[in-house]
């Protein structure tokens, strides 16, 4: 009798533990490397808030946001995602060349005229196909988030391609971006985002490329006296998740999370340009740096100098994909 009672007690304990475990919310750790007041930072917080407020998800899913490389840095976050240590990231599109060469298209200099052109390509069939192109590597793309168009900064005035010659520019870990600077006889240096300020301050690098919001949020204007408004390239992000984690979610939860991501994406992309313009004005108001816009003729010189990079990566990316991206500039 005692043995039976003990067995029943153990069974009940296991059952109660199972119920408690079933009631535990699904935790989504969303890590990123930038500040909260950037387009990506705002998007992550918006996603967290909307999940917490959703009647269907609020007791089932908990989102935790880790900004400013506070959980994993630039070089470690992708590995952490694949190991399941984080569930969501939004890396720069420059970070995916090891998983699919086609995504290098977003790093090609002077490919897109403006963010409207980027939108047309990303929301078209070719852009959407890229989101699911890495599932066999364990990565599922959920959306594209804008940051914005890139500008140059340096410790000297850089107006024409010849002015960049010999300067050391920080780049993300991207073969295309390395070749972009080599095309103007500058020296690219790979460096994580968190190291950029110190690298510029100490002279490890002389300049960099980024968006206004990233420049201002990291106070790069304190260590860079000159900015050149080139709009030469794109910094966008892909919101990604671990494919096994995503496919293992209950179907109703997965569908609702995707719906919220889609809603957040609309807002992030709507706000990105406004955030960049506000950041640009803050840099002007700080009176620490000079911003030089380019004339059409000067910009064309940069375009011609960097255009050979397209040919170098055409086979890897796909000539048809590049043509589709170019066509987005002409769409009405």
Describe each region flagged by the PLM.
Residues 17-19:
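N-terminal signal peptide c-region/cleavage motif recognized by signal peptidases
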Residues 2, 23-117, 126-128, 132-332:
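N-terminal secretory/targeting leader peptides
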Residues 12-15:
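Repetitive helical segments and hydrophobic/amphipathic motifs
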């Amino acid at each position: 009798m005692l043995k039976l009672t003990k067995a029943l007690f153990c069974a009940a304990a296991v059952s109660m533990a199972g119920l408690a475990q079933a009631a535990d919310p699904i935790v989504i750790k969303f890590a990123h490397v930038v500040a909260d007041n950037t387009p990506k930072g705002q998007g992550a917080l918006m996603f967290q808030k909307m999940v917490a407020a959703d009647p269907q998800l609020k007791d089932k899913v908990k989102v935790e946001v880790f900004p400013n490389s506070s959980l994993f840095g630039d070089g470690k976050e992708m590995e952490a995602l694949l190991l399941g240590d984080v569930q969501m990231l939004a890396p720069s599109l420059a970070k995916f060349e090891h998983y699919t060469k086609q995504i290098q298209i977003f790093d090609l200099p002077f490919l897109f005229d403006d963010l409207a052109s980027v939108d047309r390509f990303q929301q078209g069939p070719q852009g959407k196909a890229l989101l699911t192109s890495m599932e066999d590597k364990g990565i599922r793309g959920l959306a594209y988030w804008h940051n914005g168009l890139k500008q140059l900064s340096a410790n000297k005035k850089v107006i024409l391609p010849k002015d960049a010659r010999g300067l050391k520019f920080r780049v993300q870990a991207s073969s295309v971006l390395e070749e972009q600077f080599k095309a103007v006889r500058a020296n690219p240096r790979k460096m994580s985002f968190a190291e950029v300020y110190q690298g510029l301050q100490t002279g490890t690098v002389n300049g960099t490329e980024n968006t206004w919001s990233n420049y201002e949020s990291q106070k790069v204007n304190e260590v860079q006296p000159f900015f050149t408004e080139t709009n030469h390239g794109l910094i966008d992000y892909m919101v990604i998740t671990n494919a096994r984690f995503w496919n293992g979610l209950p179907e109703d939860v997965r569908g609702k999370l995707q719906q919220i991501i889609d809603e957040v994406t609309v807002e992030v992309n709507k706000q990105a340009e406004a955030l960049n313009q506000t950041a640009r004005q803050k840099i002007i108001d700080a009176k620490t740096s000079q911003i030089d816009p380019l004339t059409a003729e000067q910009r064309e010189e940069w375009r011609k100098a960097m255009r050979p990079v397209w040919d170098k990566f055409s086979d890897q990316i796909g000539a048809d994909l590049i043509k589709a991206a170019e066509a987005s500039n002409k769409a009405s």
